[in-house]
Amino acid sequence: MGNWDNPEGFMLGTQSGFGLFEPGKYAPMGRMDRGRSMDQILRETCGTKYAEEFWKRWRRLYLTEEDIALLSRRGYNSVRLPIRAGSFLYEEPGITYNEDSFAMLNDVLDWCETYQVYAVVDFHAATAGQSGIPCDDGVDNGQHLYDDEESMERMFLLMEEFMRRYKDRWIIGAYDCINEPISMTPRREELTPKLVYFYEKMIRRCRKIDQKHLFLLNGTQFSSLTYFFDHEFDPEYHNWGISLHAYEMVVPEVASLASVLRTCREQKICLWMGETGGRNEHAWQTTMYEILAEYHAGYNLWCWKTVEGAGCASILNFNVPDEWHLITDYAINGAAKPSYEHAQAIWDSYLECLAVDKCKENTQYHPYLLREGDFEIPAIGYNALPMDSHRGLSDLPNATGYRLYDRFELVYEKGYHPEPAGFAAPGPIKHPRDHVQLQLGAGEYASYTIREKETYTVSVTYCADKEVKVQAAIQGETLFEGVMPPAGEKVTSDVHPYFAYETAPNTLERFTLGTVTGEGILKIEVLDGCARFGQIVIRKSEK
């Protein structure tokens, strides 16, 4: 639920501010790249009294009961609630808590209980800033939490207050601590031991109050480096895990997760993908998330609601008011400031855009995230587990560099030539896996999990020079056994449907294997001949 209590510029329709923190160079916060600077612009354009009341309205309008109800209806069972310390603990001498913020959170937790949606309370923006990037709501791009003894103590006190208030709230599934610490900084090696100290002391102090709830600890560098979780962080209760973040830059295969999965096994702890997404990355999403599910790791899409064009996989999008540019032009480009009255009207209009019924729902994500309804699975996105769910017989690693250990022939489609750097090509993120096919010969097979509970058809797209004998089964029950005819491959120069700087995948023939009711694991095996498969196509709409 990004933007709700911890706004970020790129999700607001302003600026991202994700600039590199260069060694020895001070990097102040942007004019409107985080909640702290958004508050400053509010005070400049609308006045202090308006700004103070605005935040109460913002938090209650950005996340409403209807948001939680819709989230539940769509099949999701948890919501991550990113909070900023400054919303709950006033930034002034002494310890004074913002009771309105706690009242607001209490309402959200009540809705979560009503709709059976677990809440993961995410300490996204710690006191003084822990990340060095705008999402930590710091005053600049430093990581002052680790250097400032008072700020660290205030963070401990705030977390202890959460434990006191919510130790008996069963709907809280976990505490996510602390978001993306020590990212984009040359001080990572220096600060990592201080982060370890913070985690160890945090858990010791919190456990004196709350012995029940799970703590999910983030690695450094955008929650991706987890090597320092090499010992027990919760020695008395052993109720902790790792929160990992991964987007489409990460190759969707077990090898990408091997290090953290091994750590989790060694420490006997759980893994949770606390942030993931990838705008229009349906093939990536349905492949990566199934791998996570197979290894019993939950995942959380970033994020639920953002401004249109934010560039992340949000379920809901809202449009900014027509005159929003007057605020951003003033804040970022130095244009004339609207009058107080005019600016207040613009901000009021912004609040009106946040309601669920004013948003556009991006329903295309649901089928790929949940594997229900109408969706496609890339043939190369076959199940990783159990180990006998797939069998390749090649004596050479495939030439694409993807899933090298499975002994399958993965081949580029006709006419496609990847850039020299392959999957790590410079510039805009390329999608060579969209142009890779799974070649199956006699005795080879692959499996795919389908979670649609009603009736649907199963098809494949493929090409084959000659007839190929295939058997397809779901949960051991034969769906199809017979001959698929020769099929061609139409080379295309069309623009990719999602990525304007790439060509679309080639067109393959589609062959319907049959109709089935209920979820299960689809196994496709070639009995004789050879075929190259592009997609597994599931259509509830064609039953």
State the predicted function of each range:
Residues 1-229:
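Active-site mouth of glycoside hydrolases
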Residues 13, 20-33, 256-259, 390-404:
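Short, polar loop/linker segments at the starts of domains and inter-domain junctions
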Residues 20, 85-89, 127, 181, ...:
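Feature marks short, surface-exposed loop/turn motifs that line or immediately flank catalytic pockets
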Residues 80, 176, 300, 383, ...:
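Residues embedded in well-ordered beta-strands within globular domains across many folds
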Residues 83, 179, 246, 303-306, ...:
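Residues that line or immediately flank small-molecule/substrate-binding pockets and catalytic motifs
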Residues 156-160, 164-303, 316-320:
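Extracellular glycoside hydrolase catalytic/binding regions
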Residues 283-377, 383, 390-391, 396-407:
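Aromatic-rich peripheral "rim/lid" segments of glycoside hydrolase catalytic domains that contact
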Residues 354-543:
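Extracytoplasmic
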